[in-house]
């Protein structure tokens, strides 16, 4: 089945995911395009309401339960595979691949990956993600892998929101490296193109789409200062110190987007980037991104303006974290 098959449902994993929200945005955009959406969710809770309002078909399943994926993939022509920065991605990919083969293995699968996905990545998650992609390929699935080698704007409130609000500081181990950035919505737009218009990409199973903007964390702090009307500064710290801070955040907010695997992954990547500088796969080209998706990408400044209340809200709440650096 191909993108020209407009009758079969498109399976969206991660449809209620929090960080980046690519699955939810993709579901909405597919429904706007008149496509049938089947959303895979782990449980029926309040997060499915927006999906139901869109007219999406809700299927309960878990990437760690192969049997639950069989009915989810039945009759599917296109599928979007995404997985949070967390443990278990290889098993999840194996379950997905086995279920896809059981129902015929005809679905074309778009994989939302990341620039750290590589067999020799310094990050354990990066190596695991690469292996998961290999597993999907070994199953004979028709893959288009999107290695987004950009940080999500959403990383800033997720990883640094409380320190920004409570202390006016961003702390991490990326140093003064200038990095490419993209919004979760624009990453989802790339996924939309991959599902419906794969011909817009160059030949090849693995793609490295461009980012929207090139910024150091000091520049990120400067934009925040201007938009939030208060001084925000960037403080470089060691990998170990940032990992400890992220682990404390994960402990204080169980079930949140930050978890021990994410803490290890982003602190490891931060240290590697600070040491090596800009990675070869990193490009920021807003014009090229617009040509690919058909819409102007969101800038970080526009993201902050859009999410201003998110940056300010918890300043009114008592802090559950204490700084480990002063």
Where do the PLM segments sit?
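Oxidoreductase cofactor-interface core, primarily capturing Rossmann-like NAD(P)-dependent enzymes
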Residues: 2-50, 64-67, 85-87, 99-108, ...
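Residues lining the SAM
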Residues: 13, 82, 294
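Conserved Rossmann-fold cofactor-binding substructure of NAD(P)-dependent oxidoreductases
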Residues: 56-76
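General small-molecule cofactor/ligand-binding pocket signal
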Residues: 57-59, 233-237
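Rossmann-fold NAD(P) dinucleotide-binding segment
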Residues: 71-73, 91-104
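N-terminal Rossmann-like NAD(P) cofactor-binding module of classical short-chain dehydrogenase/reductase
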Residues: 73, 77-80, 110
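A general structural signal for well-ordered alpha-helical segments in protein cores
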Residues: 93, 129, 157-161, 217, ...
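A hydrophobic C-terminal alpha-helical subdomain
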Residues: 202, 243-326
């Amino acid at each position: 089945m191909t993108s020209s098959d407009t009758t079969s449902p498109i399976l969206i994993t991660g449809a209620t995911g929090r960080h980046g929200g690519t699955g939810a945005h993709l579901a909405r955009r597919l429904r706007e395009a008149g496509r049938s959406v089947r959303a895979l969710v782990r449980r029926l809770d309040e997060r499915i309401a927006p999906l139901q309002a869109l007219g999406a078909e809700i299927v309960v399943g878990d990437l760690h339960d192969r049997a639950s994926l069989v009915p989810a993939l039945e009759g599917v022509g296109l599928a979007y595979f995404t997985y949070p920065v967390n443990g278990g991605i290889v098993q999840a990919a194996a379950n997905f691949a086995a279920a896809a083969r059981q129902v015929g293995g005809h679905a074309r699968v778009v994989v939302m990956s990341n620039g750290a996905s590589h067999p020799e990545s310094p990050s354990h998650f990066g190596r695991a993600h690469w292996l998961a992609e290999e597993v999907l390929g070994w199953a004979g699935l028709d893959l288009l892998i999107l290695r987004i080698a950009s940080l999500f704007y959403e990383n800033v409130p997720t990883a640094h929101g409380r320190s920004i609000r409570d202390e006016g500081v961003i702390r991490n181990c990326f140093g003064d490296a200038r990095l490419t950035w993209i919004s979760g919505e624009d990453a989802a737009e790339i996924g939309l193109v991959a599902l419906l218009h794969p011909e817009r990409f160059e030949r090849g199973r693995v793609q490295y789409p461009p980012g929207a903007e090139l910024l150091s964390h000091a520049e990120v702090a400067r934009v925040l200062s201007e938009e939030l009307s208060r001084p925000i500064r960037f403080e470089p710290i060691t990998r170990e110190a940032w990992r400890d801070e992220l682990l404390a955040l994960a402990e204080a907010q169980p079930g949140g987007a930050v978890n021990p695997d994410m803490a290890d992954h982003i602190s490891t990547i931060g240290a590697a980037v600070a040491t090596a500088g800009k990675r070869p796969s990193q490009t920021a080209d807003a014009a090229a991104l617009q040509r690919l998706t058909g819409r102007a990408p969101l800038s970080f400044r526009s993201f902050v303006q859009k999410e201003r209340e998110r940056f300010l809200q918890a300043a009114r709440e008592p802090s559950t974290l204490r700084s480990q650096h002063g």
